[in-house]
């Protein structure tokens, strides 16, 4: 399949990756396998022994055909991207060792990685989580903080970063919360009584005085609570109660959307609540629009008590 001179080049390339580029053994093995697949495809494509000339003259059609074949064989986007990176790396090595000049392969972009949505939790898993999250914290105000924060995320669909940025100013409106999310997109989310009640209870026993513009969720030392700290609490929860491995703060945001959809909320309203579509400013948001959003939300939301 391969001309002996090609195998010698591959061996030198592997040594280069290990000794000069300091690549891990795992990476070198993966790259070698990807290059091997590429050269096997080249052999099949040309119906001939693969020589250095075949490698030099490989055109864009051959390379794209190889990528397409990998896609048809159900390789993940990450695997396809890594394969292309491996072959590009080999070609770069050939350039470096004066085996060839600039090649067409460097103009081919890696496929965009598919962004997988986090899996949602069942309503039973959510109920268990909300019921038992208070068991972690060791201090009453921390326990109440954990519950208030988790209920807030599940009841509003906020990103963890958005939830941890909530201040006392956000609590002044009794009907809804106004959030400026990613890309400066504004959205309006109705308050559920259970959320405001829990936050109020938490603030009443919080041992730190806060200004109106300071985030209300604090760590044990009084500083702004960090996402990693809260997710550690969730790890304890899911391990003790045998909850799904994908349970994280963000999975409650996804569950918020999934459960609303299951309970009859329309997709447009859910997109608005999640901040996936731009909304007008609050001033341009008519009272009718707000009332409609509140109506859809409160009638569909699984936890309304």
Curated annotation (Swiss-Prot):
InterPro entries: CB (IPR044068), DNA_brk_join_enz (IPR011010), Integrase-like_cat_sf (IPR013762), Integrase_catalytic (IPR002104), Integrase_recombinase_N (IPR010998), Integrase_SAM-like_N (IPR004107), Tyrosine_recombinase_XerC/XerD (IPR023009), Tyrosine_recombinase_XerCD (IPR050090)
Domain Core-binding (CB): 4-95
Keyword field contains DNA-binding: yes
Active-site residue numbers: 159, 182, 250, 253, 276, 285 (o-(3'-phospho-dna)-tyrosine intermediate)
Location of the protein in the cell: Cytoplasm
Superkingdom in the source lineage: Bacteria
Gene3D superfamilies reported for this sequence: 1.10.150.130, Intergrase catalytic core
Listed GO CC annotations: cytoplasm
GO MF assignments: DNA binding; tyrosine-based site-specific recombinase activity
Subunit structure: Forms a cyclic heterotetrameric complex composed of two molecules of XerC and two molecules of XerD.
Protein name (database record): Tyrosine recombinase XerC
Species of provenance: Rickettsia canadensis (strain McKiel)
Name of the coding gene: xerC
């Amino acid at each position: 399949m391969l001309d002996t001179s090609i195998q010698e080049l591959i061996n030198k390339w592997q040594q280069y990756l290990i000794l000069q580029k300091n690549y891990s053994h795992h990476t070198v093995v993966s790259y070698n396998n990807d290059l091997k697949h590429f050269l096997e495809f080249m052999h099949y494509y040309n119906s001939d022994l693969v020589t250095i000339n075949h490698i030099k003259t490989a055109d864009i059609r051959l390379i794209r055909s190889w990528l397409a074949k990998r896609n048809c064989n159900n390789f993940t986007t990450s695997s396809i991207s890594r394969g292309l990176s491996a072959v590009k790396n080999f070609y770069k090595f050939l350039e470096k060792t004066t085996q060839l000049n600039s090649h067409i392969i460097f103009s081919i972009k890696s496929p965009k990685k598919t962004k997988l949505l986090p899996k949602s939790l069942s309503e039973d898993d959510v109920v268990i989580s909300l019921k038992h999250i208070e068991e972690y914290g060791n201090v009453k105000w921390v326990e109440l903080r954990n519950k208030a924060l988790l209920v807030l995320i599940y009841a509003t669909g906020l990103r963890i970063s958005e939830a941890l940025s909530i201040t006392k100013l956000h609590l002044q409106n009794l009907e809804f919360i106004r959030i400026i999310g990613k890309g400066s997109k504004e959205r309006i989310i109705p308050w559920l009584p259970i959320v405001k009640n829990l936050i109020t209870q938490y603030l009443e026993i919080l041992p730190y005085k806060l200004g109106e513009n300071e985030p209300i969720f604090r760590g044990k030392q009084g500083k702004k609570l960090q996402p990693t700290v809260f997710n550690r609490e969730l790890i304890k929860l899911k391990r003790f109660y045998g909850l799904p491995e994908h349970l994280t703060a963000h999975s409650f945001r996804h569950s918020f959307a999934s459960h609303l959809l299951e309970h009859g909320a329309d997709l447009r309203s859910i997109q608005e609540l999640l901040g996936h579509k731009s909304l007008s400013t609050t001033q341009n948001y008519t009272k009718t629009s707000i009332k409609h959003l509140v109506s859809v939300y409160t009638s569909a939301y699984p936890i309304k008590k």
